[in-house]
């Protein structure tokens, strides 16, 4: 896993301190949420979203702030997203490529999110289960590879979708050592 993440993230990932193996990506997402949020914190969730995201936020004691993605391209409104960040969330959940709508966020969209995450000191929890299921002309960009984002990104994924082994429940987190250690 560390070799894979190192290759795709363009940085050396330490398998002993920056990878956490989980029982599927659902556990990875919940562990990430519980690591960086406390009861009463707020978490931004793009909508529509995979059914667990809102529940994960609520179960961790956080309050979800829903930001709509508008069809047909499922783009977000930059002003609405910044308004959500102005509520000082502790984290944002980013599913890229998105489940259920299939949106692949562009580099410029990710950079906009990254700039807000840095400005408002917000963690970004990514669900990148569909990272290798992307069709041209789209291109998946790992959020953690954006300038300044490694330190505040918890990248969650699994082997289920790409390798068609959903029953094996093999998930993982790739995160900076201080965060991975808490998980």
Model features per residue range: what roles?
Residues 2-42:
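Phosphate-binding glycine-rich loop
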């Amino acid at each position: 896993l560390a070799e894979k993440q190192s290759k795709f993230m363009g940085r050396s990932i330490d398998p002993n301190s920056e990878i956490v193996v989980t029982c599927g990506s659902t556990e990875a997402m919940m562990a990430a949420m519980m690591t960086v949020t406390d009861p009463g914190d707020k978490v931004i969730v793009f909508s529509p979203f995979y059914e667990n995201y809102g529940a994960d936020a609520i179960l961790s004691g956080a309050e979800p702030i829903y930001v709509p993605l508008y069809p047909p391209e499922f783009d977000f409104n930059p002003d609405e997203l910044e308004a959500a960040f102005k509520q000082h969330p502790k984290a944002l959940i980013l599913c890229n490529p998105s489940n259920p709508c299939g949106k692949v966020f562009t580099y410029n969209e990710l950079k906009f999110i990254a700039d807000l995450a840095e400005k408002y000191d917000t963690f970004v929890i990514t669900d990148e289960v569909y990272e290798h299921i992307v069709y041209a002309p789209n291109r998946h960009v790992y959020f953690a590879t954006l300038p300044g984002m490694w330190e505040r990104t918890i990248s969650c994924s699994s082997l289920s979708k790409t390798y068609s082994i959903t029953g094996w429940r093999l998930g993982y987190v790739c995160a900076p050592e201080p965060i991975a250690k808490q998980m």
